Amino acid sequence: MIDTRYLLIVISALILAGCSTGSRGPALPEDFPETYVAGQTAVPIIVDGKLDDPAWSAAPWTAAFGDIEGDAKPEPRFLTRAKMLWDDEYFYVAADMLEPHVWGTLTKRDSIIYNDNDFEVFIDPDGDNHDYYELEVNALNTQFDLMLTRPYRCGGTYDIGWDIDGLKTAVDIQGSLNDSS
């Protein structure tokens, strides 16, 4: 098996902005998603898809990612984890994803990216499960960003025309792309 690492770094000034609807979040502690405390960096990160900036070495990895459906699905076969940092201007996310066959076909912004290998970030500034942002980036560095009023399962509406102001992304693939040989 080829050990292909797919890495992306996402930056957005807008993600630090908050919004409030007064809605309640999950009612029970077991309903809460995993959390991660992003550290502050004094020096801006270079957005190149690599984790060789000194600030990244001090940031801890998240726990290994699981399926969005939780225990109803088997453990993922390949490791995915992330790191997050912020400074006075940006919020940074880096992902390390092991995948033997990285594929990317979509090149148009706001395409339905999850049809390719992708990494998705959901940002809910006030933690109420409403008025949140979604960003997806595929192996070709194609971006899909939108704002949702609430989750789809709750009748939420979305705005695909909305773009993350100041967004910068980069992807570094250590291995092959679109080659299963």
Residue ranges and their predicted role:
Residues 1-8:
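Bacterial N-terminal signal peptides that target proteins for export
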Residues 19-181:
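Structural preference for beta-rich elements and adjacent junctions enriched in aromatics
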Residues 8-17:
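Bacterial N-terminal signal peptides
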